[in-house]
Swiss-Prot record:
It comes from Desulfitobacterium hafniense (strain Y51). The keyword Ribonucleoprotein applies. Keywords: Ribonucleoprotein, Ribosomal protein. Belongs to the bacterial ribosomal protein bL28 family. One of its GO terms (molecular function) is structural constituent of ribosome. This is Large ribosomal subunit protein bL28. PANTHER family: 50S RIBOSOMAL PROTEIN L28, LARGE RIBOSOMAL SUBUNIT PROTEIN BL28A. It holds the Pfam family Ribosomal_L28.
Length: 63
């Protein structure tokens, strides 16, 4: 799936952006995903992972 972290499942969030003149428009917030080579079930695969999972060490990177 696009725009979803393979580890924690973080995806796109939607909401309303409010300008200084209080004009409200719909917008989306996308997670900061990186395509990395990681070890999944003993085999190296390429997955999309958010940077929070990368920084916290939840991903075992393939060498």
């Amino acid at each position: 799936m696009a725009n979803v972290c393979a580890i924690c499942g973080k995806g796109v969030a939607s909401g309303i952006q409010v300008s200084h003149s209080h004009i409200r428009t719909k917008r989306t917030w996308k997670p900061n995903l990186q395509r990395v080579h990681a070890i999944v079930n003993g085999t190296p695969t390429r997955i999309s992972v958010c940077t929070r999972c990368l920084r916290s060490g939840k991903v075992q990177r393939a060498v």
